């Protein structure tokens, strides 16, 4: 992290802006989501979607994916150079669901990418509005985080499924920029780096020549992003070692896995933003709301307020529970896949249950699924309270070298105790402290051993009533001290990763 003077808030990253004051940030974030809303309305008009169809989250996702695909320059270039059977590189599309004779029918649509780009630019005052595109990517990433536990991906890179709370943003595309980097978890960054190092081990030319130089720059940049997420000097020093390695190999992979494990207790700082589906912004714009004039923030009350009065529908398969589908989407909207379920339940005002107890599959419907039995229901996305999103990781004391929550990466800045089984985690650290990073490893292990489970994170921070938009009256919840609520581990979570 550079000095404080060059630190940008997430909203600045999100909107690509340089340093701005709070009002300017609110206005530029407002401009961004307003553009998404205008684009969505225009697409609904083009596709002749009824009001009900336009509020269907599956239609929203198809439209979002079309615009992301239309602006994916790298892939577009690749498709043009490697023409594959049955793929027109100039077109994009997907399933649109319409209501016909009391049934939902799927219609596959195709559009020229050029046309989609034109509509998007027109909705965004003629600009490319990459910030808005990144915003949609983060919404899709948050939805994936809530839907799938990345067990297989973790095991493939030699990490442990228990580290899944470090995997936020693991499905974000490479092109998601600074705003994307801000929301990536420690595990996601470690995994990207390990994949890169493995390629280097298997392919002698990976680090060589002109391409190799670019690869090296990318490697060092990723190392710096990861370093900036760590909050203790020893973890950062270890990242310097990994970055400066002449020829990254197994030693670096070992170091990275060690660091990822250490992040279960010495949490990294990972940003959280409430990114909503395009149809929600569309509904607000259609009702005459002027986002740019009113201003908008992704980390305050605004997304809660927007969801309080938006009616969004979802298709529901025959044996799915609509309340569970709602929970999945609510978690995605608030980037709360790795939040403590006790905190989420308190804010939402209804019990949030672990993944393995949800009777629902993902939101999207595969093209081979039979539509006959598919119904739709209203998603319940409202909340009882609102809370400020955090990026701190929830370490307790000022030296920042204290306990975060195991298997939880906090989303909301709300006081909670940190119940955790230190023994389980520390067992992973037996043995190997030799090699060039030995002193740092020893220091990191010492800090972890000194972490006290009885500490409280976010001391004095609370939730707020939805009428309290200036956040003047924090309500500090008290939680049952004994059990920490992890979404993926409150049960025997099934493997949903297909």
Curated annotation (Swiss-Prot):
Which UniProt keywords are listed?
Capsid protein, Helical capsid protein, Host nucleus, Host-virus interaction, Ribonucleoprotein, RNA-binding, Viral nucleoprotein, Viral penetration into host nucleus, Virion, Virus entry into host cell
The record's Gene Ontology cellular component field reads:
helical viral capsid; host cell; host cell nucleus; ribonucleoprotein complex; viral nucleocapsid
InterPro entries reported for this sequence: Flu_NP
Query: Where do the record's region annotations for Disordered lie?
Result: 1-21
SUPFAM superfamilies in the record, alphabetically? flu NP-like
**Modification(s) after translation:** Late in virus-infected cells, may be cleaved from a 56-kDa protein to a 53-kDa protein by a cellular caspase. This cleavage might be a marker for the onset of apoptosis in infected cells or have a specific function in virus host interaction.
Residue ranges annotated as motif Bipartite nuclear localization signal? 198-216
- What does the record list as GO biological process? symbiont entry into host cell; viral penetration into host nucleus
Chain positions of motif Unconventional nuclear localization signal: 1-18
Q: Where in the cell is it found?
A: Virion; Host nucleus
- GO molecular function terms here? RNA binding; structural molecule activity
Describe the function of this protein: Encapsidates the negative strand viral RNA, protecting it from nucleases. The encapsidated genomic RNA is termed the ribonucleoprotein (RNP) and serves as template for transcription and replication. The RNP needs to be localized in the host nucleus to start an infectious cycle, but is too large to diffuse through the nuclear pore complex. NP comprises at least 2 nuclear localization signals that are responsible for the active RNP import into the nucleus through cellular importin alpha/beta pathway.
Q: Its quaternary structure?
A: Homomultimerizes to form the nucleocapsid. May bind host exportin-1/XPO1. Binds to viral genomic RNA. Protein-RNA contacts are mediated by a combination of electrostatic interactions between positively charged residues and the phosphate backbone and planar interactions between aromatic side chains and bases.
Q: Which family does it belong to?
A: Belongs to the influenza viruses nucleoprotein family.
> What protein name does the entry list?
Nucleoprotein
By which gene is this protein encoded?
NP
């Amino acid at each position: 992290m550079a000095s404080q003077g060059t630190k940008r808030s997430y909203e600045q990253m999100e909107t690509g802006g340089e340093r701005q004051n709070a009002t300017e940030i609110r206005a530029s974030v407002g401009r961004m989501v307003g553009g998404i809303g205008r684009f969505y309305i225009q697409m609904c008009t083009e596709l002749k979607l009824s009001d009900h169809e336009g509020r269907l989250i599956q239609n929203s996702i198809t439209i979002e994916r079309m615009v992301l695909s239309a602006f994916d320059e790298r892939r577009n270039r690749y498709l043009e150079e490697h023409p594959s059977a049955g793929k027109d590189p100039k077109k994009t599309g997907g399933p649109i669901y319409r209501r016909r004779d009391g049934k939902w029918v799927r219609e596959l649509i195709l559009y020229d990418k050029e046309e989609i780009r034109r509509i998007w630019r027109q909705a965004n005052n003629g600009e490319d509005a990459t910030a808005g595109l990144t915003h949609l990517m983060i919404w899709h990433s948050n939805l994936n985080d809530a839907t799938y536990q990345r067990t297989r991906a973790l095991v493939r890179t030699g990490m442990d499924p228990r580290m899944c709370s470090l995997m936020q943003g693991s499905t974000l595309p490479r092109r998601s920029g600074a705003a994307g980097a801000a929301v990536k978890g420690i595990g996601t960054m470690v995994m990207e780096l390990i994949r890169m190092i493995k390629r280097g081990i298997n392919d002698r030319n990976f680090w060589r020549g002109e391409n190799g130089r670019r690869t090296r720059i990318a490697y060092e940049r990723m190392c710096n992003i990861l370093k900036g997420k760590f909050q203790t000097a020893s973890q950062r020093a270890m990242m310097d070692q990994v970055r400066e390695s002449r020829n990254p190999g197994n030693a670096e992979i070992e170091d990275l896995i060690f660091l990822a494990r250490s992040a279960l207790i010495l949490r990294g700082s990972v940003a959280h933003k409430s990114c909503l589906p395009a149809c929600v912004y569309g509904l607000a714009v259609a009702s005459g709301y002027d986002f740019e004039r009113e201003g908008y923030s992704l980390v305050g009350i605004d997304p809660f307020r927007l969801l309080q009065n938006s009616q969004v529908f979802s298709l529901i398969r025959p044996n799915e529970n609509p309340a569970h589908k709602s929970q999945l989407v609510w978690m995605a909207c608030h980037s709360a896949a790795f939040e403590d379920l006790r905190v989420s339940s308190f804010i939402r005002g209804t019990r949030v249950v672990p993944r393995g107890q949800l009777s629902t599959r993902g939101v999207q419907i595969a093209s081979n699924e039979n539509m006959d039995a598919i119904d739709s229901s209203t998603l319940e996305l409202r909340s009882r309270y609102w809370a400020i999103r955090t990026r701190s990781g929830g370490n307790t004391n000022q030296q920042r070298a204290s306990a975060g929550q195991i298997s939880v990466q906090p989303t909301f800045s709300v006081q909670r105790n940190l119940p955790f089984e230190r023994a389980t985690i520390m067992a992973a650290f037996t043995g190997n402290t030799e090699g060039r990073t030995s002193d740092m490893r020893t220091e990191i292990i010492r800090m972890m051993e000194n972490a006290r489970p009885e500490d409280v994170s976010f001391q004095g921070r609370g939730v707020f009533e939805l009428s309290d938009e200036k956040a003047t009256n924090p309500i500090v919840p008290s939680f049952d001290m004994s059990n920490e609520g992890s979404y993926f581990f409150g049960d025997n979570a099934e493997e949903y990763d297909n």
